[in-house]
Amino acid sequence: KIDTERLVERQQFDPTLLDPLLRDLLGEPGILPDRERGQGSGVIINNNGLVLTNAHVVERVDDVSVTLADGTICEGQVLGTDSITDLALVKIKESNYPHFAPLGNSEDLEVGDWAIALGTPYGLEKTVTLGIVSSLHRDINSLGFSDKRLDLIQTDAAINPGNSGGPLINSNGEVIGINTLVRSGPGA
């Protein structure tokens, strides 16, 4: 699980709504600092503590923490993001990680292969859903995302908010993709 925080400034209220007499008495409304929190998923991909996740999970954040499967909370550092492919690398600031997910080859996939989505939807840790590969090379532009360059694997494994950044794995336990988006609403 990946938790993020960023400092944002919010105006207390719209100054145009303040009566001019009250404004003279109280002064101009100030700006309040606030912490915005986010959550997503990720997967450790080597024994040096590199975590692969989505760029939209960790972009423009001040703090990143990674909760491991055993409940250990580690400080993370964003090493890089690519908003075009929606991928990011986070380095866990700890030592050795003997357990990490092997990377598979998505080019070996066929429609009908098993697809297993892991993540923390709605903050529910260690969630696993099962489905199949429904389509390969799905064009994201057809979904209205013209700013991305993704070659999508479509699956019917349940993906929900918070699954973003979590691994999509094959029946051999190899990472074949990173859960990125959910299509919902009419026609989904």
What are these language model-derived features?
Residues 1-188:
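Serine-dependent protease modules
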